[in-house]
Design a protein with these regions (language model features):
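Ribonuclease/tRNase effector modules and their secretory precursors
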Residues: 1-111
Length: 111
């Protein structure tokens, strides 16, 4: 079973403001993909409500965190973020469906 980095990420996020959030990809593409507004995404990340699991990734000489927000058995969202130059950078956002959530729970993630 993988280690959960939720508490570490929550502590880091508390040091940031909404003004420090930057999107790594085209914001319109990400908003359309998850059918949410920019304010909703910012509020969700800053509050960390529904955050159930955080996975740490080392890629391209930087530390990335995959944040899994679960809203029920059928719905969820995954954010991939990094902290760079006093900015919280949202690299990408995915929606998680029923099959994906079921697959992750079978893998042993406590989602």
């Amino acid at each position: 079973m993988e280690k959960d980095y939720s508490e570490e990420v929550k502590a880091i996020i508390k040091t940031y403001n909404k003004e420090n959030i930057v999107f790594g990809k085209d914001i319109d593409l990400l908003l359309k993909r998850v059918e949410a507004s920019k304010e909703q995404i910012e509020e969700e990340i800053m509050s960390c409500n529904s955050l159930s699991f955080v996975k740490k990734q080392v890629k391209d000489n930087e530390i990335r965190y995959a944040l899994f927000f679960i809203y029920g058995k059928k719905k969820g969202r995954q954010y991939v973020i990094t902290f760079r130059n006093r900015e919280l950078r949202i690299i990408t956002v995915f929606t998680l469906g029923k099959k994906t959530l079921k697959k992750y729970s079978k893998k042993g993630l406590n989602i």
